[in-house]
Amino acid sequence: MILQNRTFDLNPNDIAGLELVCQTLRNRILEVVSANGGHLSSSLGAVELIVGMHALFDCQKNPFIFDTSHQAYAHKLLTGRFESFSTLRQFKGLSGFTKPSESAYDYFIAGHSSTSVSIGVGVAKAFCLKQALGMPIALLGDGSISAGIFYEALNELGDRKYPMIMILNDNEMSISTPIGALSKALSQLMKGPFYQSFRSKVKKILSTLPESVNYLASRFEESFKLITPGVFFEELGINYIGPINGHDLSAIIETLKLAKELKEPVLIHAQTLKGKGYKIAEGRYEKWHGVGPFDLDTGLSKKSKSAILSPTEAYSNTLLELAKKDEKIVGVTAAMPSGTGLDKLIDAYPLRFFDVAIAEQHALTSSSAMAKEGFKPFVSIYSTFLQRAYDSIVHDACISSLPIKLAIDRAGIVGEDGETHQGLLDVSYLRSIPNMVIFAPRDNETLKNAVRFANEHDSSPCAFRYPRGSFVLKEGVFEPSGFVLGQSELLKKEGEILLIGYGNGVGRAHLVQLALKEKNIECALLDLRFLKPLDPNLSAIVAPYQKLYVFSDNYKLGGVASAILEFLSEQNILKPVKSFEIIDEFIMHGNTALVEKSLGLDTESLTDAILKDLGQER
């Protein structure tokens, strides 16, 4: 447990004192996020809600569960991390999300959306079985109500009536504008006036009526429900209170007191302003959701924009270019149009763009149906979020061999977001699925060719991956070439050992190749390109070389080296193969270069490892 290193007086009866605490927390959040980067606007918008929670509840007896948890900065500051908050998202510093190994006050790991109510239901069930005092309190926000798991949890909660408080932090935005009929309908319902006290008075009056008019009274009550903003939740058996002003501490405190006394499932609807307290961010939701270091006075980024396109930009530009000529191309994303680059397709062809909200499983299944109808759906998705849709990939796309195209962004180590966001699993779980074609580009130019190949491939689902930020391999080092199904590319033939790169691993292998050349060791270099199917000529390609070294940004177990070893084994070829992939553990947050160095994946460490394997000193 991290001990308290700054004392806050959170007296629920001293609203003025709580407001001063809120200002102190906002100032600290702005100070640190402007220096380190992080999730700014969500955390600023949730300050009063979190202060109210801490003022009334002991979070070790009443677990606080933060949905996604990127809005939990105020919680960290209130639980012994005020001074250490300066290390936010830094290597070996504080995580940007709740993390139980960091603090006993962080109840559950989080990073992906919409899990909080499900976790809360599990806690409530356990508390009932243990006859424990207290109840879980979930803070939801940023579009979590668009995901299926939220409604799955509500379904059980409303039926079982477990004591639980849910606070819906409604800032009318997820990461970008919320999508879907449910979000829109709930948003409209929730913009009405505060009905709770009026409804209580109506119920009181109805209870005094004689039994002879009970039927009419009950009909009036049912009719009244239809005009209240909480009808959706109350029909599920969940008490609804709100809307309230999520920045009014008096309203927050009184509402939490009421919810606490009910000892039933309660949803408090709180309306907040994303970016509250920082005028530059207020009203500019998507730009200020997740930010890099910026100047606090001007709001301008401290990092100049690179002249080199990011992989995401290279992908989206190519897709837009193809979409102009091919009306069958459609773009699909799960609440990440800007992050995946599909915002360009929205502007150019709005009818051919589909943001399905935070519903990855639906994204994959509906795309499979579009593919069956002759369209070419490019599902643009982060590697970490694709894992939420695994069954849809298997059941709905691959069994029927429907030609969806998975454009897997943020593949590999992603840096400051850490364990919950690393893109390290897709290689292992996708290559185990029949009918799936898997390939990876080595730089922006071959990424463009990968998009073109995917567009033409119509016999099965296919997937290609690319990193966040930039490729390791610089532009123009090797001539770009088109993709041919199952064909690798030998970039350098001469040498006694062979370095095999897959995707971004080609750039890493090339840097090692140059470092070894300075030691008078010549290495051949192979761009594997296709992981599935592997090049049928691979056994002949590797035959001249004494040892093989494999480089790729994914987990080692079930990874690229495993695929190569399986292939060679089936050919009865015994060849030493050493893997430089990711070890079998969840990788922490931090600057990507520092994280890679800690894993021995920087050029110097890789070169030393090969020299040692060859029996030579550096």
Curated annotation (Swiss-Prot):
Record field: catalytic activity:
D-glyceraldehyde 3-phosphate + pyruvate + H(+) = 1-deoxy-D-xylulose 5-phosphate + CO2
| Recorded GO CC terms | cytosol
Q: Which cofactor does it need?
A: Mg(2+); thiamine diphosphate
Record pathway: Metabolic intermediate biosynthesis; 1-deoxy-D-xylulose 5-phosphate biosynthesis; 1-deoxy-D-xylulose 5-phosphate from D-glyceraldehyde 3-phosphate and pyruvate: step 1/1
User: If you read the UniProt record, what top EC class would you report for this enzyme, in one word?
Assistant: transferase
Q: Mind listing the GO molecular function terms for this protein?
A: 1-deoxy-D-xylulose-5-phosphate synthase activity; magnesium ion binding; thiamine pyrophosphate binding
Q: Which GO terms describe its biological process?
A: 1-deoxy-D-xylulose 5-phosphate biosynthetic process; isopentenyl diphosphate biosynthetic process, methylerythritol 4-phosphate pathway; terpenoid biosynthetic process; thiamine biosynthetic process
Family under the similarity heading:
Belongs to the transketolase family. DXPS subfamily.
| Function description | Catalyzes the acyloin condensation reaction between C atoms 2 and 3 of pyruvate and glyceraldehyde 3-phosphate to yield 1-deoxy-D-xylulose-5-phosphate (DXP).
Q: What protein name applies here?
A: 1-deoxy-D-xylulose-5-phosphate synthase
